[in-house]
């Protein structure tokens, strides 16, 4: 194994649900190897790992959570609205999210938090919500300005009241990707255990 040969410093997995994570953790522990991380989708618009207990399992096993897509394909940056939808495959998703009216409510809650922090970009609010849930967000950036804004999210934290406000607003938005329709594999190829288990 690359870890045992000293080629890598840590071992991590991606998109493992609770059962697959436990199986992997146990298998590695038998070889005296720590499972360092689980990279999963997580955001104000994709709370499934929080709701199904995966974040709790990661915490219990001392596995760091790397949360990808914390900006939910750009929908949590404030750049899109019902009148300004993205083009391409994300357009239908945008229509669904804005039709309910609840995404607008979430963005309004994010704007309230932003105002509490000198008008911080909504992207920073989204990133800091993930941080407040104990994850390490890994947002994408297309420009140097976006990369800098993402990094500046580390300069401040959400208060407990702000987290609560965002939790409540987020809970009103229907899941934009159903876990059982995820593009990721359903079962670990080695153990056969469900990755997006409930």
Question: Predicted segments — roles?
Answer:
Residues 178-182:
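Short coil/turn segments at secondary-structure boundaries
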């Amino acid at each position: 194994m690359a870890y045992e040969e000293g080629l890598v410093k840590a071992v991590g997995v991606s998109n493992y649900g609770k059962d697959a994570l436990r199986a992997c953790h146990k298998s590695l522990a038998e070889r005296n190897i720590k499972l360092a991380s689980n990279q999963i989708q997580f955001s104000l618009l994709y709370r499934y790992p929080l709701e199904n207990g995966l974040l709790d399992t990661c915490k219990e096993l001392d596995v760091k959570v790397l949360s990808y897509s914390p900006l939910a394909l750009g929908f949590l940056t404030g750049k899109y609205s019902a009148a300004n939808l993205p083009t391409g495959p994300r357009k239908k998703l945008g229509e669904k999210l804005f039709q309910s009216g609840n995404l607008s409510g979430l963005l309004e809650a994010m704007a309230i938090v932003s105002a509490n922090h000198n008008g911080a970009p909504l992207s920073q609010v989204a990133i800091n919500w993930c941080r407040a849930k104990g994850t390490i967000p890994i947002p994408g950036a297309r420009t140097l300005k976006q990369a800098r804004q993402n990094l500046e999210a580390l300069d401040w934290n959400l208060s407990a009241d702000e987290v609560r406000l965002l939790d409540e607003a987020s809970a009103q938005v229907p899941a934009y990707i159903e876990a059982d329709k995820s593009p990721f594999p359903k079962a670990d190829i080695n153990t056969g255990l469900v990755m997006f288990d409930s």
